[in-house]
């Protein structure tokens, strides 16, 4: 919440290991981990947003433009993940995690070189961020904050926007994983689509 980055990069690998230990079918382990990770961002994002709102850092015009695209992108991200095998998803997520680790380890930060585009351009950027976030099972902060910083948005506003935008990503992404996994015969008990309720409740 402090840095606008959710816990998906930690939650997803832990869930993958946990589901593997429980004997969940290998072909759905990663999908189940991604689908279970996203709903947690609704709760953490709301809590973080309240704090940023009280601090007066929330730019609702910018958030509405980003959020509209993120809703569409996150739904498509979940549908895309459903088309990929667990092994392919693992490779994609691993590459993303290494990229984030290198970025933080080398302290690579985008320079403010431009300004936010208009409503359409901002919405398209939101859709891309939402698509990738749902594909990786994260709230989007690791992409939203750098994108907004690159577009000369002050850091406090960028972090606040990231917290707010994690909720439409989490909502649309969760629904897409629920829909994609509905009725899958290999799901463990207490699953709703690709969302495993006991793990979700434990994380929240």
Identify the function of each model-found stretch.
Residues 1-3, 10-31, 36, 45-136, ...:
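Juxtamembrane transmembrane-helix boundary motif
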Residues 164:
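Active-site pre-Tyr helix/loop in NAD(P)-dependent dehydrogenases
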């Amino acid at each position: 919440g402090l840095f606008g980055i959710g816990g998906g990069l930690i939650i997803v690998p832990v869930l993958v290991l946990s589901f593997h230990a429980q004997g969940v079918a290998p072909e759905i382990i990663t999908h189940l981990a991604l689908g279970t990770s996203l709903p947690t961002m609704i709760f953490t994002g709301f809590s973080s947003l309240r704090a940023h709102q009280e601090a007066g850092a929330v730019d609702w015009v910018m958030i509405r433009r980003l959020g509209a695209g993120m809703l569409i992108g996150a739904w498509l991200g979940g549908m895309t993940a459903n088309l990929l095998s667990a092994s392919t998803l693992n490779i994609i997520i691993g590459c993303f995690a290494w990229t984030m680790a290198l970025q933080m380890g080398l302290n690579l930060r985008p320079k403010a070189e431009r300004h936010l585009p208009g409503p359409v351009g901002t919405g398209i950027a939101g859709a891309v961020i939402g698509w990738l976030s749902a594909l990786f099972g994260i709230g989007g902060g690791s992409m939203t904050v750098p994108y907004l910083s690159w577009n000369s948005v002050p850091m406090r506003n960028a972090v606040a926007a990231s917290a707010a935008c994690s909720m439409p990503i989490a909502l649309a992404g969760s629904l897409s994983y629920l829909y994609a996994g509905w009725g899958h015969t290999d799901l463990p008990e207490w699953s709703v689509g690709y969302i495993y309720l006991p793990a979700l409740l434990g994380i929240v």
